[in-house]
């Protein structure tokens, strides 16, 4: 017989299969959250960004990590409470338990130069002078940018193209590849087509 805890996991997995769970992933700055917000705005889905689950809220932010098990449980509980969801960000290396839940994966790819320009604008808009020389987040900002730049050339031990290539091979759902520089409406249209929704919305 299944243990109570294991049987509960099986029941939850079956329940999660009955809804759309879209995983949007790619390099930092490639627009995964932007596309996730667009999908949720248009289709009424719930947006779940992996950073929300990965990091414990601190000031300054991004200092303390949750354990992988805690992240997984929080994500599964939030999926269970929602009708349909988009999970934006990276789950590679710690989110394998969620793979059976996915009904569609969307991989966004973008040139490094464009990504880094977008990231700088985002960081400046959120943190302002805090990331400038002398600011309390300047060192953290510099380290973050060095990490983000390494996506295209880094090994599978970090969040990189190599790691996402490995992660993608594990996915059993359809994987849609999108150009991050395409217009947001064009990207949403392709997601809608992949979901079989576009004709119903035109």
How does the language model describe each region?
Residues 69-113:
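Glycine-rich phosphate-binding loop used to anchor ATP phosphates in small-molecule kinases
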């Amino acid at each position: 017989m299944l243990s109570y805890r294991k049987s509960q996991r099986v029941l939850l997995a079956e329940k999660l299969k009955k809804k759309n769970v879209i995983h949007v992933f790619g390099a930092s700055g490639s627009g995964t959250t932007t596309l996730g917000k667009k999908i949720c705005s248009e289709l009424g889905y719930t947006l779940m960004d992996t950073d929300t689950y990965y990091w414990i809220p601190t000031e300054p932010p991004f200092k303390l990590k949750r354990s992988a098990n805690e992240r997984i449980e929080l994500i599964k509980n939030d999926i269970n409470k929602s009708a349909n969801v988009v999970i934006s960000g990276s789950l590679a290396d710690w989110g394998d338990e969620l793979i059976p839940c996915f009904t569609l994966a969307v991989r966004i790819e973008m040139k490094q130069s464009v990504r880094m320009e977008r990231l700088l604008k985002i960081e400046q808009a959120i943190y302002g002078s805090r990331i400038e020389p002398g600011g309390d987040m300047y060192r953290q900002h510099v380290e973050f940018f060095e990490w983000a730049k390494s996506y295209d050339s880094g090994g599978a031990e970090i969040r990189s193209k190599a790691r996402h290539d490995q992660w993608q091979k594990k996915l059993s759902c359809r994987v849609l590849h999108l150009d991050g520089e395409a217009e947001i409406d064009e990207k949403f249209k392709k997601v809608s087509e992949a979901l079989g929704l576009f004709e119903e919305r035109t």
